[in-house]
Structure formats: C-alpha cells, structure tokens
Curated annotation (Swiss-Prot):
The keyword DNA repair does not apply. This is Probable butyrate kinase. Keywords: ATP-binding, Cytoplasm, Kinase, Nucleotide-binding, Transferase. It comes from Bacillus cereus (strain ATCC 10987 / NRS 248). The keyword Cell division does not apply. It comes from the Bacteria. CDD domains: ASKHA_NBD_BK. Signal peptide: none annotated. The gene is buk. InterPro entries: Aliphatic_acid_kin_short-chain (IPR000890), Aliphatic_acid_kinase_CS (IPR023865), ATPase_NBD (IPR043129), Butyrate_kin (IPR011245). PANTHER family: ACETATE KINASE (PTHR21060), BUTYRATE KINASE 2-RELATED (PTHR21060:SF3).
Length: 367
C-alpha cells in the first residue's frame, strides 16, 4: 500500500490543532496556542489566515517535517452553504464563501483557506471533510409548524460520520449499507438518523432543538420562551446565551463540567442526580424519536463524544433504548484523525472528491 502523507488543520478561536499523518498513522499532533493579544489585532477572523499559516509552517519546521513530502492538506470545513457529506476539493467558490462568511463568521472558516494556501504552493490538493453544514435531510424532515420556518441541519457531522464508518467496519459492513442512530454528546448533543450513508434527519444541536446538554438548552417550552423574550428584562444577545452557552447544565446546576456533576451524583446530591438523569432521559427520548425516522430498522445505536466516557450517563441511556438495537459506545472524538481519513479515502480513490458549486441560490455537490 502506497504511503500518503497528509497535513491536517483544525482552527479554533484561540488555537490551531495540526496533525501530520502517514496514511492513518499520526506522525505529529500539536495544539498551537495563539496569544489572545495577537489574535485581537485582527478585525475579522478571516484576516488571521496569513499569521496562522506562518505559525503552522514554523511549527512543522521545528519538528523536522518536510512539507515537500506532503501529498495533501485537509482543513476543517467552515460555515458554507448546505452541502451533502463527503470530502470536497477546496476551490474558488468555496474560498469566496469562506472569506465572505456566507453562513457566518467562525474560526473553522480558516480551515479550508489555510489548507488551500499551503497546498497551492506545493501543487497538491486541498480538501475539507464533512463540515457542520452537511445537510442530507429529507424534505419531510424540514417542515416545521410555522410557514417560512424550516428545520435546519446543523450538527457534529465530522465526528458522527467518522464514528459511523468505524462502527460499520467493526460490523463488517459498509457505512452506506447500514441504518445507524448516532448520538454525539459533548458541549452540544445531536442525534442523527443515518440511512445508508445519509443523515436524513438530525436535531439542530446549536439553536435550541433536542436534548439539553452541558451548555445548551435544547428544546424548551416555546410559550414560556416567547414570554421571556418580550418581558423587557433581557436583550436579544442575553436570550441567545440562555439557549447556547448558558443553558443546559450551566443554567440548571451552575457548571458545564459533567465530571463535577457526576461527582455530585456519586455523593448522593438529589438535585444533581435528577438533572443528570433528565439529560440522559432527553437523549434517550431523542433516540427513540429518531428510530421512527428509520421505521425501527436500526442496525446499531452509537454513543460518541466526550460525555460517552460517563458510565452513569451511558448506562441511563442504555436502559431506555437498548430494546431498539444494540448500543455501541465510542467515547471521545478525534477530529484530526477524521479529517485525515476523509482525505485518505480520496487519495486512495475509494471515493471521488466532491466539488463545491454555487448556482444562483443553491449549492450542489458533484461527485
């Protein structure tokens, strides 16, 4: 088997995680911490790309990595237009949408830009893999009860699909041949119904849908939410923070640290026990609903993300859903590995790279 060396880039708000992989094997993994004062000099996130590029190249050089030996560079996908899952070649249309913040401004938008900037100088391909805007929802799943208010697909696509592929391999099947319910449990929680390689329905774990999580409110009583919004007590930004950042465990018990909450549960704290059970209850309820999307024909239920390390939480969820299908636990997430594997599938010609194309108001993916 030929050796493919891949540089992987995952930008965060104040750090950039990089990895160098020889096929699936990590040669280097490092988190580059950026000085907040240095970052603060830039008016827009996108203006940081040159600074981050030079920092990445310096770190690679310090570790003796010869970039001329790279076969591809893969960046984290940013806030693009809705696209189907897969590995995409970074092209001009994508770069324009990333730079302009078509669907929002976020550090992840730098992923594709940095990959392209480094790869183009080496005459090798630049890719992104399964960004959060992956949208494979069926038309029936998009309808809400208010005209003009469509349900949107925003979820942990990279980790959900990477773990789904691993589980398929463990079951000696292709991802495209299975029906899986994949639950990512981290700062946000998303439950995806994976039908033959497509996520045909998933809760919007960012904007108030589904189970509450360590720092997100999830689905809340809408009537009471409307009353709160128009009470005159809160600004818009304060209400948004109640849903994302200051919701969930933060609102209910004062911390987003699930380990601390578990310690409280183990000491017999009745409030912590009830709240932690409630989070597990809501996750299980979401999984149950998603099972109906797949007509109950489920090959496996998969639990992943940082919270999947919690035996208390996992056991509570299992008790309620293991009658639906076998529950497989893959705790944690490895975004660098997932990005490398996405690029590798293309380099090995196991998949064709997809092209990001903008046609008037719609984006289509062409394999």
């Amino acid at each position: 088997m030929s050796l493919n060396r891949i540089l992987v880039i995952n930008p965060g708000s104040t750090s950039t995680k990089i990895g160098v992989f020889d096929n699936e094997r990590p040669v280097l993994e490092e988190t580059i911490r950026h000085d907040e004062e240095q970052i603060g000099k830039y008016k827009r996130i996108i203006d940081q790309y040159e600074f981050r590029k030079e920092t990445i190249l310096e770190v690679l050089h310090s570790h003796g990595i010869n970039i001329s030996k790279l076969n591809a560079v893969c960046g984290r996908g940013g806030l693009l237009r809705p696209i189907e899952g897969g590995t995409y070649t970074v092209n001009d249309a994508m770069l324009e949408d990333l730079k302009n913040g078509f669907s929002g401004h976020h550090a992840s938008n730098l992923g594709g830009i940095l990959a392209y900037e480094i790869a183009s100088g080496l005459n090798i391909p630049a890719f992104i893999v399964d960004p959060v805007v992956v949208d494979e929802m069926e038309p029936v799943a998009r309808i809400s009860g208010i005209a003009g208010m469509e349900r949107k697909s925003i979820f942990h696509a990279l980790n959900q699909k990477a773990v789904a592929r691993k589980v398929a391999e463990e079951l000696n099947h292709k991802y495209e041949d299975l029906n899986l319910l994949v639950t990512h449990m981290g700062g946000g929680i998303t439950v995806g119904a994976h039908k033959k390689g497509k996520v045909i329905d998933v809760n919007n774990g960012l904007n108030g849908e589904g189970p509450f999580s360590p720092e997100r409110a999830g689905t809340v009583p809408v009537g009471q939410l409307v009353e709160m919004c128009f009470s005159g007590e809160y600004y818009r930004d304060e209400m948004v923070k109640k849903l994302v950042g200051q919701g969930g465990l933060v609102s209910l018990i004062g911390t987003n640290d699930a380990i601390k909450v578990e310690q409280m549960v183990e000491k017999g704290d009745p409030e912590a026990t009830l709240i932690y059970k409630a989070m597990a209850y809501q996750v299980a309820k979401e999984i149950g609903g998603a099972s109906a999307v797949l007509h109950g024909k489920i090959d496996a239920i998969v639990l992943t993300g940082g919270l999947a390390y919690s035996k208390i939480l996992v056991d509570e969820i299992k008790e309620r859903v293991d009658w639906i299908a076998d529950v497989i636990v893959h705790p944690g997430e490895d975004e660098l590995q997932a990005l490398a594997e996405g690029a590798l599938r293309v380099l090995r010609e196991e998949e064709a790279p997809k092209e990001y194309i903008v046609r008037e108001k719609e984006t289509v993916a062409r394999g």
